[in-house]
Structures are given as structure tokens and as C-alpha cells.
Amino acid sequence: RSHLYAEPDVKRPTAGTISISARVKVVDVSGSFCRIATGHWVHSRHLICLEYGTQDIVGTAIKFIGVPYLWGGRSAEGVDCSSLVQIALAMAGVSVPRDSDLQESAVGVEVPMDDGGDYSRIKEGDFVFFPGHVGLFMDDWRFLHANAFDMQVSLHGFSDVLDRSRSENAGVTSIRRLTSSARSSRHD
């Protein structure tokens, strides 16, 4: 989230906020501030050109650790599992649907796994889908997701997440990996 200012000066009162991945049009520049089409000023360090974005999807998602879980939320005030994925991908210039079931068929390519739960092909940054849920696989067998269990974005041991999902008769439905071609298909 970033503050909006009525003038290009951090010592002036704020005029509101914008959320991460908000699309804005820069119409003027003054020092380290950019005026956006609404007339407000935003510090330039809080803006990323859509043409370049960020390739660090995991890094973007990690910034949300501790943000409250809010079903349907899509800001630092609260996120759900699919909006966490949608925001992280949007910052990389990749547009995906809002809901996890639609993301499952739209994100990257499927990573093969056998019925016995062989996850040897999984890598950091892969998207792991369950019925109605999605998160990011991290290094050291950790799983990053917005969840109603902790009521926040948190890291869990991947084995613990698998055990909990199996106890609810809801195992992994697929693992998806973003390809380099998906990363290069930017927003318009």
C-alpha cells in the first residue's frame, strides 16, 4: 500500500492510499514524486512500470505475511488465497482470474505428480491447488498461503498442509508452474 499526497512532499498530509498492484497513469513528475491521473502524488519508489514489473513472485507474496485473511479481500487490509496469488502475479505482469478454481486452469503448466503423492518435481514458486484453495510452494518444504486456519497469510510446513487437507478429504488437485512465456505476456 502507498500513500497519496495532495502535493509532492512527504511532510504534507496524506490524501488517501492505493493498494499494491493498483494500475495508475503517471501524468507528471516532480522530484521523487509522480502525479497520477487522479491528481494525487505518489512517491516514485512505490511505482513499477508495467512494461518491466517484477519477476519475483515469491518475494511479492512474502510481503503479505501477517496480512489478515479476508474472504474476497484484495489489499493490505486483507486477502484471501486467490487474491494473494493474483496480486503476486499481477506485480510480475501476469493477469489471471480472481478465483482459485479459474486460476488452476489459467496459471502456467501442470507439474506431473503421481497418485501416491510424489512431490519430487515441485519447486519454489510453484502454485499448489486444492479444492477451493491455492498457495505457493516455498523452499525447505514450506507453503505460503492466505488461510482461514490462522486467519492471515502465513507459512506452514508443506507436509502439515498436506496432512490437514487429507484429513478434510481434500488433497492436492494440481501443481502449476509459471513458464517463461507466461512471464513475458505482460498486461496491456
Task: Please tell me what each predicted stretch does.
Residues 1-3, 7-9, 14-67:
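Boundary regions of SH3-family modules and the immediately adjacent low-complexity/disordered segments
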Residues 25, 83-86, 117:
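Surface-exposed interaction/gating patches
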Residues 42-59, 144-171:
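Short peripheral tails and domain-boundary helices/loops at the edges of structured domains
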Residues 61, 73-92:
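Active-site nucleophilic cysteine motif
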Residues 69-73, 98-99:
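Surface-exposed patches in mature extracellular/periplasmic domains of secreted proteins
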Residues 94-160:
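...with weaker cross-activation on analogous glycine-rich loops/strands in unrelated enzymes
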Residues 162-188:
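Low-complexity, Gly/Ser/Thr/Pro-rich intrinsically disordered linker/tail segments
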